[in-house]
Regions:
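Helix-coil boundary/capping segments in enzymes
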Residues: 1-111
């Protein structure tokens, strides 16, 4: 069987998003996004995230999709969550949460 390696797999970490929910800078980022994209683009992006949520979070779904695509290995990393504004304690909590989530996700199927 040929090997195909996907080197750009996204992993969504809802627990990290929960850490910044309600933060004033999170609200400012959301407002900036609304200004950068038109309403139709935002609607499409939100629908897409909802549709692919299982692929972004569930190891079994990821493995099923990989098998269907003949992908034998995948490198996963957290989806862009640019929170450069986070104060040190929050940044530490975000980093720890994200790193632990990536490690747990990969541990379920490490090869």
């Amino acid at each position: 069987m040929p090997h195909a390696i996907d080197v750009h797999g996204h992993l969504l970490v809802p627990e990290a998003n929960a850490l910044t929910a309600g933060h004033p800078r999170e609200a400012a980022d959301a407002a900036a996004e609304r200004e950068s994209f038109n309403a139709h683009s935002i609607e499409i992006n939100q629908a897409q995230i909802k549709r692919v949520f299982p692929q972004l979070t569930d190891v079994d779904q990821r493995l099923e999709d990989m098998a269907a695509s003949q992908v034998t290995h995948q490198i996963v990393g957290p989806m862009p969550m640019h929170r450069y504004w986070a104060e040190p304690d929050l940044a530490y909590a975000l980093t720890r949460t994200i790193n632990e989530a990536v490690a747990a996700h990969c541990h379920k199927s490490p090869t």
